[in-house]
Amino acid sequence: MKYLCLIYDEESKLAAMPKDEADAFMGGYFAFTEQLRAAGQYVAGEALHPVHTATTVRIRGGRLATTDGPFAETREQLGGFYLVEARDLNEALQIAARIPSAHTGTIEVRPVVDFGQPDANAAALKATAEPARTV
């Protein structure tokens, strides 16, 4: 089953990191990505440009409205994602806990709806209705 790991972090904290610390942080991402690939769990992953480059799109009353910046003003902003293959939610949470930004920000894990596998979707929705797990 596929899970999307949304990576939220404070851009200002990352930008303020000394170069050697930032290099080590990014090195952690490169190593993590290679571990996922080697385990056959990597589907996709990308970093996003800084939040000031975002544009929000809405249609209200049939009219297109765009706004510079993200949808919400929060300290942590969406900075990237991994799409991973995991047996179940518990395994996806274990994968998410290894993402470097789990130490500096927040990782949101969500099951991905696969329109080609309705039975898998039902199992994922049932699993998400259960109490939260600890990793």
Where are these predicted regions, by residue range?
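Conserved, structured core segments of small domains
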Residues: 1-135
